[in-house]
Amino acid sequence: KGEELYPEIKAIEALTKVEKPDMLMDIHSPWIGGPKRWESTFYQVGEIAPGAWEQQKAFARLLAQGKSGLYRLGDDIAPGEAWNGSAALTANKDPRTSTGWWRTVLPESFTTSFEIPFANARERTLGPDDWKAFGRDVAAAIRAWLVAH
C-alpha cells in the first residue's frame, strides 16, 4: 500500500476503521465533448462485481421515483455497454478506482458511480433549483435503500 495522494482518502480510510458505512456513491461529471447521449444524462455506470448490477438497478428504481425528473430508468450504462466495455469493466475491479477500492475496504456495502451533466440534462439547462431537487431525490433514494437493507 502506497502513500495516498489526497487527504480525503486518509480520512475515509480512518473512518472505515471506526464506522462501517453501508454505501459509497461516487458522483461526478462525464467528460466534455463526448457523445451527447452520455454528456447530458444522469446515469449509473454498471459494475461487474457479482450482484452489483442488480443492486444498482434496485437503487435506480428508488431514485427514479424522485420528483426532479432528472434521473430516468433506462439511462444507466450496463456492464459491457458502449464505453463501459471490457477495458472499463476491468478498470472497475481496479482498486485505484473509487468503486474498486471501496470493495476492497468494505466488500459487503453498496457501491455505485453516477455520471451527472455539467449544466444540461437532455435539452434542459439546469439551475440551482434543479440541483437542489436532484439532491432531495438522491437523499430520499439513499434513505429508502438504507431502510430496506
Regions picked out by a protein language model, each given a short descriptive name:
Residues A121-H149:
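His/Asp/Glu-rich mid-to-C-terminal helical/loop segments that flank catalytic regions of hydrolases
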Residues K1-L73, I77-R96, R103, S113-E115:
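Active-site/substrate-binding loop(s) of hydrolase catalytic cores
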Residues T111-T125:
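Short helix/strand-capping connector loops at secondary-structure junctions
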Residues W102-E108:
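Short glycine/proline-enriched loop/turn "hinge" motifs that connect secondary-structure elements
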Residues A64-S68, P107, R143, V147:
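Generic surface-pattern signal
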